[in-house]
Each structure stands twice: as structure tokens, then as C-alpha cells.
Amino acid sequence: MNVKDFDFYLPEELIAQHPLEKRDTSRLMVLDKETGEISHKNFYDIIDYLNEGDTLVLNNTRVMPARLIGEKEGTGGKIEFLLLKRVDKDRWECLAKPGKSARVGRRFTFGDGKLKAEVVEVKENGNRIVEFYYEGIFEEVLDSLGEMPLPPYIHERLEDRERYQTVYSKENGSAAAPTAGLHFTEELLHKIKEKGINIAYVTLHVGLGTFRPVKVETIEDHEMHSEYYHLSKEDAEVINETKKRGNRVISVGTTSTRTLETIADEDGNVKETSGWTNIFIYPGYKFKVVDRLITNFHLPESTLIMLVSTLAGKEHVMNAYEEAVKERYRFFSFGDAMFIK
């Protein structure tokens, strides 16, 4: 299947640059995966499409303020590190900008010397392994000095960094937010629980690979990046009981979907487990556990639009995206949502 099959025209002004004042007032396109029928709602209407006994699966990862801007010791030259993943207690794999400044042995300082760093290795892919030196707790130091690593298509500064976190975010480790979850408020989640809908959590730490364009012509040739995931025993039991009763598992976001489909056996059962996944879901894949999906509007030719097309049918999805452009929906991380019912 050709990557170009997932292209569509998107005017730049439809790329949302900031979140709406109230999370659940974003628009919601409801797409029937069987008929392709489309209806236009607001996100707070999602509760009308959830039935008692269903389980909503949320990714509770938390975005780290992983962008550090500092200077080279001695010369004061500027450096930017983007923390990708922890490889040891105080060692992180990072992207460095400008790369030529970040040679092995070079030392850098951040925030009046509150945090120091040394490049200890340059990997084949150009990423750096960086050792950090600090006093206290690293997460707290990072919280005071780091900036949110917003996606490359967002050019406006984010006033409130909590708006790039879900209200239920808990486990630190992502370089990007699981954006389908940004629409939920505490109040909406409370109403959902009151209706008898279960809530289960997975953790998948979203990597920067989520923004990496597909550079091959044939989608089968694309290799996905690896991301760390975890599912607890309690949450696995909630999901298995839901399937056993004949109720639906409704995944919030492509990250929750990829986690569940990685863990599920052929019968759709899941169990407590942790690991790394590079699962790539594209048309032809048969879903084992996910029945319905809440997601945002994704980039043309992205692996995310391919995943959505696998659940709802490519023709239905491409028609829905054409309609979304015509109706001037807001796209990408701070944009509107779609429910595939």
C-alpha cells in the first residue's frame, strides 16, 4: 500500500496553535465505521456514545519538560538538549542542537549551574548520551529548568504548561502528550463513571518518533520507533472482564490502542506486563481488543492516520478528513477530536 494513499489537503490555518479555554468544548466528529456516516458534535457529548459496562482506556503518561537550553562551559555557546529516554540513573539519550557543539567530553551548564551535563557518547543515529550532575531530585530540577517539547508544527508559546498534560497524567516519561486525552475534564470523567462506564489506565511513554514522517513509498517498509509501556494487573482485569461481558473497550488515543494491541493475545485477553513496543498498525491488521477509538485529527501520510484507517476503513477516514477540512475543524495536538463508533 502506498503512503500517498493517506495524503490529503490541509490548509495551514487549520493547525491549532493553542488549546481552547475549556478542554471539553472542542468539536467532536462522530464517524460510523460501518456506514461511513458522519455527525458533528462537541466533545462533552462523548458520554452519549458510551454505554454502561463499557471501559474507557486512558494513557496516564505525563510529558516531561524535556527541553533544556543552556551554555557550553568556557565559551558560553548556546546548546539545546531534548531528553528522549533515560538509559541509566543520571544518563539520558538526547537530541542536541547544534550537534557540532555536543562532542564527547564537552560540558554544559543550565540555570546558573543548578544542572550540569557532559556528553559521554555519540550514537550512530546522531543522538547523544549525556550524563547530568545536580543536587536533589532530577525530576524537580528538570521541572524548574526545562521547557515543554511542543510539536514542530506549533509555533506559539504555551502559557500554561498543564494544558499540554491530560488531567489524569501521572507517570513521568513522555516527550509528547497523548493528545486524544487532552479533551477530558475532571467533571466529564466523573459523569462518565457515574453512568457506569469503567476507566482503565495504560502507560505508554510517547517518543518523538510520533512526529517522524514516513520516508518510504510503501507503508510495509516503514519501521516504527520503540516506546516503553506498562499495564497493571488491576487494569488488565477490568479490560478482560469487559470483553467477557460482551461490552466494548474504547481506546482513548493511538498510544493506548498500540499498547493494548501489543499486549493482547489472539483471544483479545491482556495481562500485567511492561516492555517496549514498535507495533505498526496499518490496513490489513485485525484488532484483537480495541472496539472503538477516540482520537485527534492527524498529519497527512502519518502512521497515525494509517492506524485510524485500519479501524474505520480507509475510504471512510479519508472522506471524514475531507469533511473536517471543509467544516474547518482544528487539526493535530491542540485540535478537535473524532470518535469512531
Curated annotation (Swiss-Prot):
Pfam entry (one): Queuosine_synth
Catalysed reactions, as listed in the record: 7-aminomethyl-7-carbaguanosine(34) in tRNA + S-adenosyl-L-methionine = epoxyqueuosine(34) in tRNA + adenine + L-methionine + 2 H(+)
Swiss-Prot/TrEMBL keywords: Cytoplasm, Queuosine biosynthesis, S-adenosyl-L-methionine, Transferase
One term of GO molecular function: S-adenosylmethionine:tRNA ribosyltransferase-isomerase activity
Pathway(s) served: tRNA modification; tRNA-queuosine biosynthesis
EC category name: transferase
PANTHER family for the chain: S-ADENOSYLMETHIONINE:TRNA RIBOSYLTRANSFERASE-ISOMERASE (PTHR30307:SF0)
UniProt cross-references to HAMAP family, sorted A to Z: QueA
Identification of the protein by name: S-adenosylmethionine:tRNA ribosyltransferase-isomerase
Organism listed in the record: Clostridium botulinum (strain Alaska E43 / Type E3)
